[in-house]
Amino acid sequence: MAREFSLPNTRNIGIMAHIDAGKTTTTERILFYTGRVHKIGEVHEGAATMDWMEQEQERGITITSAATTAQWNGHRINIIDTPGHVDFTVEVERSLRVLDGAVTVFDAKGGVEPQTETVWRQADRYGVPRMCYINKMDIMGANFDMCLGQIKSRLGANPVAIQYPIGAEDQFKGMVDLIEMKAIVYTDDLGKTSDSAEIPADLLARCEELRMAMVEAAAEQDEELMMKYLEGEELTNDEIRAALRKGTIDCKLTPVMCGSSYKNKGVQPMLDNVVAYLPSPVDIPAIKGTLPDTEDEVDRPADDNGPFSALAFKIMTDPYVGRLTFFRVYSGVLNSGSYVLNSTKGKRERVGRILQMHANHREEITTVYSGDIAAAVGLKDTTTGDTLCDEKAPVILESMDFPEPVISVAIEPKSKADQDKMGIGLSKLAEEDPTFRTRTDEETGQTIISGMGELHLEIIVDRLKREFKVESNVGAPQVAYRETFRNAAKVEGKFVRQSGGRGQYGHVWVEFAPLEAGQGFQFENKIVGGVVPREYIPAVQAGIEESMKNGVIAGFPLVDIKATIVDGSYHDVDSNEMAFKVAGSLALKEAAKKCGAVLLEPIMKVEVTMPEEYMGDVMGDLNSRRGRIEGMEARANAQVIRAMVPLSEMFGYSTILRSRTQGRGVYSMVIDHYEEVPKFIAEEIIKKSKGE
C-alpha cells in the first residue's frame, strides 16, 4: 500500500495545557471538523471520544494521551491529547518526546497557570516548536491582551499575535486575521460557516499595532526580509507566512491565535495555522541515536528508504486486543507480521498487527511509514522509551527521562485471596506508567505503591478495581523523603575475615562530598599504583550505590553525593569482589557519621485561586503548613496566592480548602525542589522510621 500523505504533508502535534483550559474539547472539535466524528462529544457529558477510560469520563479530565489521526486540506495531522493534571506529567513528557510541534491551549481568563509553565518547560527541554491558542474567549473575564503579556513575562516566550478577537465574553463573535487584515465572523452555532468582513472600527488601531509587531518579528527571521523591511518596502503576505513558519520551527517565536472551542469558533483557522506553521517530520533535525556496539552517534533522517527505526512511547492494555505499544516511526517502513529488533533490550520482537488509533476505535493497517504514529499488537518485551529497529541496522534512539515519584502509600487487597491478582495488576500498571512504582517493604512485608501525587495513586487503585477486579485498602500517604550529605570527609571501609582457610579481605579509603541538588551520584577512581586492583573498583561502586538506596539515617535514598576512591589495600588470596563490595558499603556507613547526613523533603509550588474575601483565611492556613508566600495577584474577579509548601503538609488540602472557601477555592501544585527538613521534624521522622 503506497503512502497516502507525503512526509511534508504530515504533522505530528500535541495539544497541551493546564487542566480545564479546554484541551480535550479543542481536540473533539478538530475531529468534528476534519470529518472524523459525526457528533460532537462534550467533556461534561462524559462523551468525549478522546477521554475513553471510565475514570476520565467520570472526572472530566484526560489521564492517558490518546493518539488519533485526522485529515485537513490534504494533510495528515496526528494528534496527541495530553493530560493537564500535574500528577500525569509522565504522559506529557512521553508525548513531547515523539511530537514535532505542539499547540498550547490557554484559558482566556486564567492566562498562564502553574501546569502551563511546567508543560512549557518540558517542551523547551525537547525543543518542540509551539503555537498558542487562547481558548474560552466567550467566558466572563476573558482577556486576550493579558494572556499575550503573560506568555511573554511568565514563560519567557516571544509571542506573536496572528489573530485578534472581535469582542469578548458573551459578545465574542470571531477574530481578525492579522496577516490578511480581514475579520472572520461566525454565523452559525456549529461554527461551520463564517463570513469575512471588514475589521470593526474600534479594533483597527490595536490590530494595526499588532500587525506591525508581527511583520517586524517575521522580518527578523530572514536577512533579506530585514533589509526590505528597513528600506520601508511592504512584505507580501506569503513572505510573512514563510518567515513566521521559519521562526516557529526554529523556536524563535510563537504564533498566538484565539477562539472558543466549546462555541465552535476559531478551530478551523487553527487547523489552517497548524498546517501553515508547525513542522513536518522533514523540517526538524534528524533524530540522533547510538550504534549498540561502538556507541558512535548516528542520525536517522525521516526517509521511507532508510532503515526502519521507531521509539515506543506508551504501553496500554486494551480490553479487546490486549497489550498495545504506541510507537513513532522515525525512518523506514514497517509491515505488519514482520520482525524487528528491540535494541534497548537486545530482543527480537514480532509485530502482529498494526493499528491506527482514533481515540478509542481503531483501524487496522498493513504498513506504517516514517513520520507516522501507530500502535502495534504482539510486542512482549517492549516498554516505554525502548527503540525498535531493523535487525540489519541496529540503533538505539535517545530515550526519555521520567521524574521520580514523590508520594507512596501502602496497599493491601480486601480479601487475602486477591493477593496474587493484585500483584499481577500492579505490575501491568507499572509497565504502562514509568512514574508509577511498586515494591514490597522488606521489614513489614507490605506492598508499597509510589507515584506523582494523590490523584495519580487514586486512579491506580481505581483501575485495579475496574480492570483487575481487586478491591483494596490503602494506607495514609507517605512522602518520598531523600537523604544527603552536608559536609565532605575521607573515610575508611575495611572488611576482613581471616580465620584460617580462604578468607575475605577488602580495604578502601573513600572521599565523600555533597553535590548540587539534582546531580545524583558521581563516582571517581583516583587509585594510583594498583593498591586496589582495577577489577575490584566496580564492586566498590556497587557496594556504595546499593547502600545509598536504603539511606543512612532513616532508610530513604541518599542522593547528590560524590564518592572518590583514593586509596586502599588488597590481599593476594583473600581479596574478591564480594569483599570490596562490603568495604564500599562500610565506607558509606562510616561517612554517615562524619558527613552530617540530613533529610530532604519535596517542596511544592502551590497556586491557590479564590474570591478575595477568603484571602486572609487561606494565607493563614498556608503559613501554618510551613508555607512561604511567594506572591499574590488579582486575576479576573479572584485573588491568586503563590506559595512554596512542603508536600508533607499538603495531604488532604483540597478538603480543607473547600471548607475554608465554601467550595469556591481551587488549587494546583507541582514539585519544585527538595529542601532540608527542619531539625525537630526530622527527629520525628527518624524515630518513626526506626519504629520508636
Swiss-Prot record:
One Gene Ontology molecular-function label: translation elongation factor activity
A Pfam family the protein falls into: EFG_IV
Signal sequence, start to end: none
Binding site for GTP: 17-24, 81-85, 135-138
InterPro entries, per the entry: EF-G-like_DII, EFG_II, EFG_III, EFG_III/V, EFG_IV, EFG_V, EFG_V-like, G_TR_CS
Family annotation (PROSITE patterns): G_TR_1 (PS00301), G_TR_2 (PS51722)
Compartment annotation: Cytoplasm
Stated role: Catalyzes the GTP-dependent ribosomal translocation step during translation elongation. During this step, the ribosome changes from the pre-translocational (PRE) to the post-translocational (POST) state as the newly formed A-site-bound peptidyl-tRNA and P-site-bound deacylated tRNA move to the P and E sites, respectively. Catalyzes the coordinated movement of the two tRNA molecules, the mRNA and conformational changes in the ribosome.
Protein name: Elongation factor G
Originating organism: Brevibacillus brevis (strain 47 / JCM 6285 / NBRC 100599)
